[in-house]
């Protein structure tokens, strides 16, 4: 296990501190800059481009964010770097560009977006670790996907590894327990599914738990009752109430 208690220290801005009212879109350099300036940790999503370069983007398809249909894995990082996100000046950034911008100012919680299917993610874990090599700053890696977490472990990841998960049924807890047998360091859980026996047991064993995705003060209060820290969007968690941004 890797020491990961720092993940509890501050709220985590979901896909950066984005704000549609000010045309700051998710997973963009503008959103990451805004989060760093506010002192929030940053959550981001990483996909693998056609040239095996990790890029920061949530969806498998480009249409919602870039206005064109197509699988992100069919575009090179250079091609993606020319695509406007939400019609703004921001383009789809590489993980390397994002790291250069944040430069250790705040912690990073990076979710790796795997794919189903044999061989779909071959080399993905190694590509992420290669980009991270030498980065001076706090980093944690997480995924919904067992095979991604296994590959990160097998590749000798020096970073805390976490399970992204949801669910409130025993069969789901069984799958989560199986993933935790990899020796994971933290959990990111869907907060409406708390409390539950799986998370209660993991916290009792010393595993830090953050939640996703909190959008108001009620969710914040629920998180701090049943978990350790939150991943948030759409409000300023420092405020007593939770007005829209």
Region locations from a protein language model:
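Phosphate-group recognition and catalysis centered on beta-loop-alpha active-site segments
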Residues: 1-245
């Amino acid at each position: 296990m890797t020491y990961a208690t720092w993940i509890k220290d501050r709220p985590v801005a979901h896909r950066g501190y984005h704000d549609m009212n000010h045309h700051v879109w998710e997973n963009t350099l503008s959103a990451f800059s805004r989060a760093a300036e506010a002192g929030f940790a940053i959550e981001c999503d990483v996909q693998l481009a056609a040239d095996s370069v990790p890029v920061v983007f949530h969806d498998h398809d480009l249409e919602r964010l870039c206005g064109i249909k197509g699988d992100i894995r069919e575009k090179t990082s250079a091609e993606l770097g020319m695509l406007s996100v939400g019609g703004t000046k921001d383009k789809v950034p590489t993980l390397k560009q994002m790291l250069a911008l944040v430069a250790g100012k705040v912690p990073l919680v990076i979710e790796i977006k795997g794919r189903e299917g044999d061989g779909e993610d071959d080399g993905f874990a190694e590509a992420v670790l290669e980009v991270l090599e030498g980065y001076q700053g706090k980093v944690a890696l997480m995924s919904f996907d067992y095979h991604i977490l296994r590959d990160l472990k097998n590749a000798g990841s020096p970073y805390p590894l976490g399970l992204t998960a949801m669910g409130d049924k025993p069969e789901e807890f069984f799958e989560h327990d199986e993933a935790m047998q990899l020796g994971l360091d933290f959990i990111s859980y869907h907060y409406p599914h708390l409390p539950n026996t799986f998370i209660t047991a993991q916290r009792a064993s010393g595993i830090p738990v953050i939640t996703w995705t909190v959008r108001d003060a009620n969710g914040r209060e629920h998180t701090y009752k049943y978990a350790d820290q939150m991943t948030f969007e759409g409000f300023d968690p420092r405020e007593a109430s939770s007005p829209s941004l």
